[in-house]
């Protein structure tokens, strides 16, 4: 049984599209990058599943980011995903707290969900919705109802065991081209949403995807597309870090090297550290750094 895959399907008679995503290795890679407490682990799993689901709705090459921001215990959490299902993410919270609240609404004070879509060609689009619902899934449903007036159902669940972590998600939405697209009370959609709500955790986390879809929708006319593989992939590199340093005055960089012994840059997503010494600084500002560092660390 394969996790780290997204399955897309279509209800031909109801003009509704659906998605099922299950994450394991890709999710665990994010958790391994930092010592996140259980509450944050669960949050990142739900956010990662949601990002994968929404990434699959893109009609172009590009990426999408789901970011939660607030003045509460969780400052922000973000997952970035590309059109080909490469995901990465990070969260920041008040680490001075001895214990974080487990209730979603208590994690975010004056919180907002920001969804940013960035095509490789074209203008970036950004939408937002308040984090004023009991769950992240309901906040995402609210986003689609407000911004696109599309009936949408989202299910997000996580599982933590001694053998590792898993995150799953399901997504139903009336097709934008459907005549019922703006009818949030469409009976066909409501019927499918109620069927989807019957999914049990043990089914989501243990059954093959084909069995899940059959159990839920065996009486429906459904077309299933080939699955898409999902991986954790950070876009950081030594060269990109060097490009950022090129915008800083050379003298300032040399002062840091003289004081600290080296310039240290850490990726906020994978927490990989890149170090630059005096020779690197001279190469960066001479425009020869890429040539000098073909054997990247």
Curated annotation (Swiss-Prot):
One GO CC annotation: cytoplasm
Modification note: Under oxidizing conditions two disulfide bonds are formed involving the reactive cysteines. Under reducing conditions zinc is bound to the reactive cysteines and the protein is inactive.
Disulfide pairings: 234-236, 267-270
Keyword Nucleotide-binding appears in the UniProt entry: no
GO molecular function ontology, one term from the record: unfolded protein binding
Keyword annotations: Chaperone, Cytoplasm, Disulfide bond, Redox-active center, Zinc
TM stretches of this protein: none
Superkingdom of this protein's organism: Bacteria
GO biological process, one term: protein refolding
Subcellular location: Cytoplasm
Family, similarity comment: Belongs to the HSP33 family.
Function per UniProt: Redox regulated molecular chaperone. Protects both thermally unfolding and oxidatively damaged proteins from irreversible aggregation. Plays an important role in the bacterial defense system toward oxidative stress.
Protein known as: 33 kDa chaperonin
Source organism (scientific name): Pseudoalteromonas atlantica (strain T6c / ATCC BAA-1087)
